[in-house]
């Protein structure tokens, strides 16, 4: 699963670069409504009305961002499909790729933007199906667990033990 780890790391960098651009693009609109707010501070979020008042491109960018997030999941699923021979391997590969991508994403945001300030800094975690917010630590824990579960599944399968999507069946 080295390919999943390498893909996850590279994709994490790519996503962090895109978010760097998005933050630079959105910052003037945020400053319009929240002057003096530090650039790394994401909250409070702009309302739809504020985004529309900031210019016609702002709501369009939000729609593009939701599409980017959907494409991210499709890409992670597709790369897992490319290396898997069965549904269990697909789930394991997806978990490894997703977890690696998410952790790499936050690591590269720290390198590129010096953000987050800590693992307890709140973030917009995902926009689909509705905005999810929480401390950065939450997706890091979930992602580390996904990587561990995926690796355990593959190890058990390689030993010839019967597994069902990460559950060992003795």
Regions found by a protein language model. Give the residues of each.
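Extracytosolic (periplasmic/ER-lumenal) interhelical loops and adjacent juxtamembrane/interface segments
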Residues: 20-62, 66, 118-131
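Glycine- and acidic-residue-rich phosphate-binding/metal-coordinating active-site segment common to enzymes
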Residues: 112-140, 144
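Small-residue packing motifs within transmembrane alpha-helices
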Residues: 4, 8, 12, 95, ...
């Amino acid at each position: 699963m080295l390919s999943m780890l390498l893909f996850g790391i590279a994709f994490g960098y790519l996503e962090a670069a895109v978010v760097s651009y998005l933050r630079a693009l959105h910052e003037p609109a945020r400053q319009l409504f929240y002057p003096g707010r530090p650039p790394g501070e994401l909250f409070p979020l702009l309302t739809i009305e504020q985004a529309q008042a900031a210019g016609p491109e702002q709501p369009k960018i939000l729609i593009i961002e939701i599409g980017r997030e959907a494409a991210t999941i499709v890409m992670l699923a597709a790369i897992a499909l490319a290396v898997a021979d069965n549904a269990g391997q697909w789930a394991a590969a997806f978990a490894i790729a997703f977890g690696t991508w998410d952790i790499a994403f936050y690591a590269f945001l720290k390198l590129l933007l010096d953000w987050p300030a800590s693992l307890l800094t709140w973030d917009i975690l995902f926009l689909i199906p509705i905005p999810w917010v929480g401390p950065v630590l939450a997706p890091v824990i979930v992602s580390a667990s996904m990587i561990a579960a995926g690796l355990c599944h593959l190890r058990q399968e390689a030993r010839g033990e019967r597994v069902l999507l990460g559950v060992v069946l003795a």
